[in-house]
Amino acid sequence: MATDHSGTATAKALIRLAGPAAWARRIAQFAQIAAAGPHVRRAVVQRHGLELSLDRIAKGAVRVPSAAERRVLDLARETVSVYATLPPAGRERLRALLHACLADDGTLIPLFHLMRTAALQRDRGFSVAFTGLAEGTPFDLLLERDGVQAEVACDVVSAEDGRGVHRGAWVRLMDRVDPDLQTWLANHPGRYLLKLTLPQGLRRDAADQDLLAALHDRIRTMLSAQRRADHDEAAVLRLDPLMLAGAQAGELGLLNSLRQEFGHEAHLAVTECGGGVFVMAARAGRENEVAVAIRRRMAAVAPARLSGTRPGILAMFIEDTDRAEWRHLRERLELEGEARQFLTFPEARSVVAVTCTSRLELFGATAPDGVPEGELRFRNPSHPSAKAVALAPAVLSSV
């Protein structure tokens, strides 16, 4: 068989598992969603980069895959290989998982997180069985090394669950507001900064669509009336001149400067028209609690997914985060603190270790953006198997 240097055959094989018609519909859905505006379009490309990359590769649009694309292809190849080893019921479960990944707001992350977790443990000397797929066990993987077994439950948690202002809602607001800002700049040349504080938050669910429309109307009314401030219990808005040094004039320099001023939690957007610049910076009324949301998810997953008859490992994938936030969670020890707190809870009785990873590690990012060894690990010192030598490569704390 010819070597698949471009990855085309691998990508096509995964698409055949999904069903070519279902895959084509999914790619078409991305185009429909992206038509909402440029901010939503960028968000779609970022969130669904796995699917879009595989689609381009399958169509022969990528002659030489990048390092990140090669990692994606490795996971696609692993998926196809695992499918071939499964019994009929297991193959149906894998197809069902793949179809769920391609439905609604889903991505391939749950499937690829499972495959990547298995590959990491094999590289550490464990034999790995896909019992969740093959047998329908609540946990996903059964590890064994030197006669000692451990269960692994893989789960994906969105950083949005810990944010007061969802990025998904923010990009939709920006696409609503951007034409108004263009008009404003055309009639009022200059540099402006609109700061928004949203005490009640802004989420992407249907319940907040009315709030999104109301906030858009308030911004438009504020600009048309040339007011500098507006506030109520839902939002505090303030319009100020934007002060720029020479080095900050470009969009990249401006965003870096604003990020330093407002912090990693701020939602930022820049609109330009002619020589005018309009910046919007939004924050919730309280600090984000991403690490807290992860801890709550772990407390829900552990008793539901681990049998309690063997040492259990929770393999958590942190989705919808970025470089700045991921580094903040690690460097400020927020993630470590919440993980270690969880390990003291009754729900963690069967958990010997927790691992955490993100897209940065999946795509091969190195320190300081990515985590060495591909994941953070936190061992539960109170678990009876915490010091088991056979389990050490999978459970020893990485920090």
Language-model segment annotations:
Residues 129-136:
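A short glycine-rich beta-strand->turn/loop micro-motif centered on a GG-aromatic cluster
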Residues 1-124, 132, 156-399:
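Charged, structured surface patches that assemble and position nucleic-acid processing machinery
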Residues 136-153:
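Short acidic loop-to-beta-strand element that houses the catalytic metal-binding Asp/Glu
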Residues 120-127, 145-148:
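Secondary-structure boundary elements
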